[in-house]
């Protein structure tokens, strides 16, 4: 029994190691990517001199951007209160759902703009909260550009 378990682990561990994704999973939120729709999952891979995006479903290449072509990196957050969900849950659970209104989910966004010769483009992507800082640090590292906080640029009247 121990030999079978040892054999199984010896075969499983190398398979899991090679199956790992060495990039980031992001969600396209709009912009000038060809054939992409809002909400499409993308894989982001940072190379030495380029930024590579491919579609998560099918693995087809979306776009390959030279790091030297990036003109701006921006980032921001979108925060909502869950009032509608809290009201619905409070009606069913006799008020306990009201606690849900106190939570604030955050969505983290990163924007890229580029100009590669006569081709200009840009788009926004939503990052996982665990990968957000890694994506920003990687983009800043290979482009040499400092990311700009888009929330600080917003004018509020």
Language-model features, listed with the residues they occupy:
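Positively charged n-region of N-terminal signal peptides that target proteins for export
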Residues: 1-6
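Bacterial N-terminal signal peptides
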Residues: 8-15
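Anionic N-terminal interaction surfaces
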Residues: 17-50
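Acidic, Ser/Thr- and proline-rich intrinsically disordered linker/docking segments
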Residues: 20-22, 69-157
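Short polybasic amphipathic segments
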Residues: 25, 50-54, 110-114
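Glycine-centered tight beta-turn/hairpin loop motif at sheet-sheet or coil-to-beta transitions
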Residues: 37-39, 56-60, 115-120
């Amino acid at each position: 029994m121990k030999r079978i378990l040892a054999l199984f682990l010896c075969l499983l561990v190398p398979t899991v190691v090679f199956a790992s994704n060495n990039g980031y999973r992001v969600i396209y939120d709009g912009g000038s990517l060809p054939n992409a729709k809002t909400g499409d999952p993308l894989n982001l891979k940072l190379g030495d001199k380029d930024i590579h995006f491919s579609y998560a479903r099918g693995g087809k290449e979306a776009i390959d951007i030279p790091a030297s072509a990036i003109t701006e990196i921006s980032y921001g957050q979108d925060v909502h209160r869950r009032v509608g969900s809290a009201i619905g849950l409070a009606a069913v659970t006799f008020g306990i759902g009201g606690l849900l209104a106190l939570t604030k989910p955050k969505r983290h966004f990163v924007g890229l703009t580029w100009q590669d010769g006569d081709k200009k483009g840009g788009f926004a992507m939503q990052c996982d909260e665990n990968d957000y800082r890694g994506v920003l640090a990687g983009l800043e590292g290979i482009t040499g550009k400092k990311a700009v906080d888009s929330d600080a640029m917003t004018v509020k009247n």
